[in-house]
A protein has these predicted regions:
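Bacterial N-terminal signal peptides
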Residues: 5-15
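Non-catalytic beta-strand/loop surface segments
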Residues: 18-59, 81-120, 153-207, 231-280, ...
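Active-site SXXK
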Residues: 65-79
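M16/insulysin-pitrilysin zinc metalloprotease superfamily fold
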Residues: 77-81, 113-144, 296, 320-390, ...
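PAPS/PAP-binding and catalytic site of the sulfotransferase fold
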Residues: 126, 210, 221-228, 347-351
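C-terminal regions of mature proteins
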Residues: 209-214, 333, 365-370, 374-464
Length: 464
């Protein structure tokens, strides 16, 4: 067993706990390469198990975009070599288990929650689903139809469509430009042989991580993991090392403007900016700016887009997407179509002020500090509260641990000993730090702007 400094890294990437006392835990890498993290939480009789695989749309090309998503469906909803779909579903219900899966640009995750008394069943069924997959044509055809319906829904949802278009144009020339959900034409012609090839290539234990959080005995679960997953080393040893053309996303060369038309009543304008990847030192600053601009009761963007006491836009939101090799900062607005140009102009004008904005009361003379809004302190409090609230969910915590120990293994040399724990850095963040971050990423000089307008008959326009 190869041990690593996972606990240190967990605190670096904001997945460390802020409990009065850290829960008991174990962390290691098996000889076959599987990264493991176990944490005991006995205040609720539940066990949460997450298995993460380092495969996503970043590993596809134009001829395979959608196979990862299809594979996720087949593992989640399909049969195994030992049981039919109906038999598996019956056993899941009998044991009170909830099973789900997600695919992103970087990872595929499988999440299982169930009563603590049935934790062994959870391990057994998860292992069976992941490593004893049975691909049969009727199930493949069924899941394809489900995905086609998902794709249609996304094309008709202005929020989802705008996000896809923004990311596509922000990451031109990089695998991140490909949609996570895939392309219909690729999925339609995907064969069992192609799916199986993808499955065998990426479902090797050195490419995976396992996290367990809940009411468990650490030693007993540790032994179960070694017995259940340790013997799969023969598969790992026979597999060729994964070769990836892993590289940072190229910088955006110039502003891109995209217009689409849908059968909707309101207009939607979305701005997308390049942002730092997961684990980057600037991640924290943009986390806080994200809260200040678009979250909470009175986000700063609302103030910026208000004239004469009336809002120019509604449903203002911000979103920071962190990926392994790049990031995106998105600003969403909804408005009456006649206000589109005004909102675009006002938003860009406002973003150009963020480099010298007073985020903290410390930016003002002492006599004025009691009269101003301290955006920085409010955001810090929200970070701590949200962090604690997030980790109180065992499945959320397990998801974070699985994702981040896998990331740590890939980037250990870049991270070890180079940064203080996340919450320490939150407390130390200053208004000057936010101004520097805003200047670096949100200057408004280069961006992708997506506008979704209400008229589906006019087709599409792309301006570069």
């Amino acid at each position: 067993v190869k041990t690593i400094g996972i606990i240190i890294f967990i605190s670096l990437l904001a997945v460390g706990t802020v409990w009065a006392e850290d829960p008991p835990s174990k962390h290691y890498i098996l000889n076959n390469g599987l990264s493991v993290y176990i944490q005991k939480r006995d205040h609720i009789p539940l066990v949460n198990i997450v298995f993460a695989v380092n495969v996503g749309s970043k590993d596809e090309d134009q001829n395979t975009n959608g196979i990862v998503h299809l594979l996720e469906h087949l593992i989640l909803l399909g049969p195994t070599q030992f049981q039919t779909v109906d038999e598996i579903n019956l056993e899941m219900r009998r044991h009170g288990a909830q099973f789900n899966a997600h695919t992103s640009h970087d990872l595929m995750t499988f999440e299982l929650s169930l009563p603590a008394q049935y934790w062994e069943f959870g391990f057994n069924i998860l292992k069976e689903k992941l490593f004893h997959l049975k691909l049969v044509q009727p199930q493949v055809d069924k899941e394809k139809e489900i995905i086609f319906e998902e794709l249609s829904q996304h094309q008709e949802d202005p929020y989802a469509l705008a996000t896809y278009l923004a990311v596509e144009h922000l990451f031109k020339g990089h695998p991140y430009q490909q949609p996570v959900y895939g392309v219909r034409s690729v999925i339609e012609k995907a064969t069992i042989e192609e799916i199986e090839t993808f499955y065998k290539k990426y479902f090797v234990l050195s490419n995976c991580a396992l996290a367990v959080v809940g009411d468990v005995d650490l030693a007993v679960v540790d032994n179960k993991i070694r017995q259940g997953f340790g013997h799969l080393g023969e598969i790992e040893e026979s597999a060729a090392p994964l070769e990836r053309d892993s590289k940072p996303a190229p910088p955006l060369k110039k502003t891109v403007k995209v217009e689409r038309y849908l059968d909707i009543n309101k207009a939607h304008v979305i701005f997308a900016f390049e942002a730092p990847p997961l684990g980057h030192p600037d991640q924290l600053g943009l986390d806080i700016i994200n809260l200040i601009l678009g979250k909470g009761i009175n986000p700063l963007l609302s103030r910026a887009l208000t004239r004469m006491g009336k809002p120019l836009a509604h449903n203002l939101q911000t979103r920071y997407i962190m990926m392994e090799y790049g990031g995106a900062f998105l600003i969403y607005t909804t408005m009456e179509p006649k206000k589109v140009n005004q909102v675009r102009m006002e938003l860009i004008k406002f973003l150009k002020t963020l480099w010298n904005f007073n985020y903290s009361k410390e930016d003002y003379p002492l006599g004025q500090q009691s009269e101003v809004t301290d955006y920085l302190e409010a955001a810090k409090s929200q970070v701590k509260f949200s962090h604690q609230q997030f980790l109180e969910s065992g499945i959320n915590a397990a998801l974070s641990y699985a994702r981040n120990i896998l990331f740590y293994k890939l980037h250990q040399d870049e991270i070890d000993g180079k940064r203080e724990p996340y919450m320490v850095r939150v407390d130390k963040t200053t208004s000057a730090d936010l101004r520097n971050t805003a200047s670096r990423y949100l200057s408004g000089e280069k961006y992708v702007m997506v506008t979704i307008l209400p008229d589906k008959k006019k087709g599409k326009k792309v301006k570069k």
